[in-house]
């Protein structure tokens, strides 16, 4: 494989340092940028671009066309061009480029499908776990919190004990772009957190992480995914259970009950309303009121 020219690589390395140090983006987002820009640099060399100052709109279209021919789907191609636009915007801000040649170049639109979710009956079936050991209590608490608050997997794993106000039934989470938000979690989730916290010390906690592995360390995302899938099979739920499906189900059930798109946007932590609109075929008190009135586990108060 031909080495990437330093005239392409060095500006990309500087941009990635900017994303890490100044923007403080998550490691996964940084990795996504790195992968997309590495692929683009290799394609750029194939079409004779060895310096970013020689990239023009015609060559950007060539990069998009080659990516498409390589089998990239519309959503992935849109992500690649978005990464390129962000990088070129940064080069403009650094005085390397006078204008962004990728501005205005769009990929063909692909239909956005409603994410698959679990219906309320299946969700109740999943959550009726036989609590025969502390790990089952931990898993029940994780399931209740994830579905009860619509958390991202990274937000669930990153939750610390100090982030939870049990009396108020609220959690503080750090979402995408290091944006913090306060969320209601409902009475049922609070109850199961209390059950879990009564057993947490059995795991020999090594820090303030809310959910622990057998070794007393913060549970990993891979472990959560594995445990959720296993519980789906054990509970006889027809749907394959993975963490993001619980978030989709939270959003769908909330919208079905409340019809309040803006409130659900805030609860999910979406920066743009259009992201939340895929679920449709303010102040915190308002969000809490919508939540209490609409979320199945808040209304039932099951334990």
Curated annotation (Swiss-Prot):
Regulation: FtsK may regulate the catalytic switch between XerC and XerD in the heterotetrameric complex during the two steps of the recombination process.
Domain Tyr recombinase, residue spans: 113-292
Gene label: xerC
GO cellular component: cytoplasm
Stated family: Belongs to the 'phage' integrase family. XerC subfamily.
A biological process term (GO) from this entry: chromosome segregation
Species name: Serratia marcescens
CDD domains recorded: INT_XerDC_C
Keywords, sorted A to Z: Cell cycle, Cell division, Chromosome partition, Cytoplasm, DNA integration, DNA recombination, DNA-binding
UniProt subunit comment: Forms a cyclic heterotetrameric complex composed of two molecules of XerC and two molecules of XerD, in which XerC interacts with XerD via its C-terminal region, XerD interacts with XerC via its C-terminal region and so on.
Gene Ontology MF annotations: DNA binding; tyrosine-based site-specific recombinase activity
Catalytic residues, chain numbering: 152, 176, 244, 247, 270, 279
Pfam family, one: Phage_integrase
Protein name: Tyrosine recombinase XerC
Function recorded in the entry: Site-specific tyrosine recombinase, which acts by catalyzing the cutting and rejoining of the recombining DNA molecules. Binds cooperatively to specific DNA consensus sequences that are separated from XerD binding sites by a short central region, forming the heterotetrameric XerC-XerD complex that recombines DNA substrates. The complex is essential to convert dimers of the bacterial chromosome into monomers to permit their segregation at cell division. It also contributes to the segregational stability of plasmids. In the complex XerC specifically exchanges the top DNA strands.
Predominant subcellular localization, coarse grouping: cytoplasm
Consequences of knocking out this gene: Defects result in partial SOS induction, inducing some overexpression of the nuclease NucA protein.
Subcellular location field: Cytoplasm
Highest taxon of source: Bacteria
Domain Core-binding (CB): start-end pairs: 6-92
